[in-house]
Amino acid sequence: VSGLAEFRSRVEAFLGARYPRRHETLRHGQGDDSLVGAAFRDSDDEAGDLRRARAYQRELFDAGLAWLSGPVEYGGAGLGAAERQAFAEVVRRYDVPDVNGLLVGQQIVAPAVLAHGSADQRARLLPALWSGELVGCQLFSEPDAGSDLASLRTRARQVDGGWRVDGQKVWSSGAHLAHVGELLARTSPDPASRSRGLTMFLLDMESPGVTVRPLRQMTGTAHFCEVFLDDVFVPDDAVLGEVGGGWAVANVSLSSERDNFGDESANLFIRLLDRLLLLGQEVGAAEDPDFRDRLADGYVRHVVNQVLPASLETATPEVATAGTSLVKLFATDADRRLVQLALDVLGPALVADTGAWGTYAWSRVLLGVHATRIAGGTDEIQRNILAERALGLPREPRPVREDRRR
């Protein structure tokens, strides 16, 4: 416990010397009233957010506070879940740059590199991703392969010195700003199993033949992208894991994405909670019993989700893997409940801009928060994982799909 207290003090000292505490900057009617991070902001804001995030991440990395659970030889701190939780609690008290634009590289790409990368890939990429030097993106989903990822159609054919890749990816967060992409492609057909014959590659996003097109979302922003791959050359040393073993690599990334979803959602939740409290005080809802009860209910759900990851550390591998789905379900549910409360308080002012500070700003959150039911694996997929892997229930019948390649 004393060691953990010392760690908290160290984090407090580091952040306190560089950034203001959030309670010192949070005032209703003052400053920018935007509520969301890089995923929902305009493109100019997103690029600026990323610049600030990379500078902040470099500071953390140099101080040994960037990758708390990572191996020391790759720039990590070699610490455990308790320190990670303590850091998260402390950092939420400070007005630090939004690191949303770095999370795919750190929480999806980096775990796969650590688990399956060569010695060179680990030494070269892990410190770069965690210091903010490199920004990563995920190139898994396709127009006809989302939840059913094993049906992907992007192909990689072997040539002298590497591979030539052709295909299309979609819903790739931040691909227009990324340096490296974790790319899943089919390298050989396997009639017995669609998940075999897939290979993972580490794609240089500046490679000739890579075209990235941001997709306009209903929030009005364009954070997600579609990526076209036209005869893109990928060298042999960019294969991540074994040729034909891409499914195992993908599962590492997907499990880590679910596991870390709670951290990302927690940061959003605290921002929304603070602003909702201010809003309630401003419009006179703070004394309403229903408002207070729903606010407390959402916060309790949030706290439960914060302790779930630590409890999973002692679970069996099967339950621990499935438990990451529970983390994601709890996180998205807490966020949606809070946004619904804001909608009930504000009514039409949430969707019609009256010019009042801190009201219409919720509209973009309302539009964006429902995407969390899909991002990182749909709620339905998460429930299937829990049912089949943790509870041992029968597998859901898989529909027979027509082979569209004929």
Across the structure, where does each feature detected by a protein language model lie?
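Amphipathic, small/basic residue-rich leader segments at the start of a protein or domain
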Residues: 1-103, 124, 128, 354, ...
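A short core secondary-structure module
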Residues: 166-212
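Glycine-rich beta->alpha junctions and the first turn(s) of the following alpha-helix
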Residues: 210-306, 372
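A structural signal for short hydrophobic beta-strand segments in well-ordered beta-sheet cores
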Residues: 154-157
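C-terminal helix-coil-helix/basic helical segment that borders enzyme active sites and/or dimer interfaces
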Residues: 27, 285, 289-292, 303-356
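Glycine-rich phosphate/cofactor-binding loops in nucleotide/flavin-utilizing enzymes
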Residues: 82, 86-87, 108, 249-252, ...
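N-terminal glycine-rich flavin-associated loop
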Residues: 101-120, 146
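A short, Trp-centered hydrophobic/proline-enriched beta-strand micro-motif
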Residues: 132-140, 183-184
